[in-house]
Amino acid sequence: MASIAVCPGSFDPVTYGHLDIIRRGAKVFDQVYVAVLNNSSKKPLFSVEERIELLREVTRPFPNVIVESFHGLLVDYARSKNASAILRGLRAVSDFEYEMQITSMNRVLDENIETFFMMTNSQYAFLSSSIVKEVAKYNGNISDLVPPVVEEALRKKFASLTSNERNES
């Protein structure tokens, strides 16, 4: 039986930290579904479709990685993919408490799906999509934080937002 994992997240945008976890997960599991959360309570910078497109581009070198979106409960999505594992990255101890709550709830919902935590490579321990967006918004250098295609998408997105703001005033 193939080992299948789901690596969930909002990926708004995907960073080198995310890619580190996906790449390492793809070495451990036969199949990894990168599941882009369609969270209606958040107002993302990129649409789900844009995030999927960027993720597909940057995960192209990994033949056993499939990028899709999902809504609803993660365990339901994992079950629909016959996944026995959820793969999560941890940057710091501060991530652990939140992740333990989610893991405990997922275990209540389906005790057959295990959660695996991978410590993010130390060079990405500080990295978050929020930080990347904040730096990019002010034209800071993000080339060490995100792949080139993501950097370009961020520059275009903020240029269009700035242009729209000027047109509205």
UniProtKB/Swiss-Prot annotation:
Record field: catalytic activity: (R)-4'-phosphopantetheine + ATP + H(+) = 3'-dephospho-CoA + diphosphate
Site (Transition state stabilizer): 18
Upper taxonomic lineage: Bacteria, Bacillati, Bacillota, Bacilli, Bacillales
Principal location class: cytoplasm
Protein name: Phosphopantetheine adenylyltransferase
Molecular function via GO: ATP binding; pantetheine-phosphate adenylyltransferase activity
Protein family (similarity comment): Belongs to the bacterial CoaD family.
Coiled coil spans: none
Listed EC numbers: 2.7.7.3
Subunit structure comment from the entry: Homohexamer.
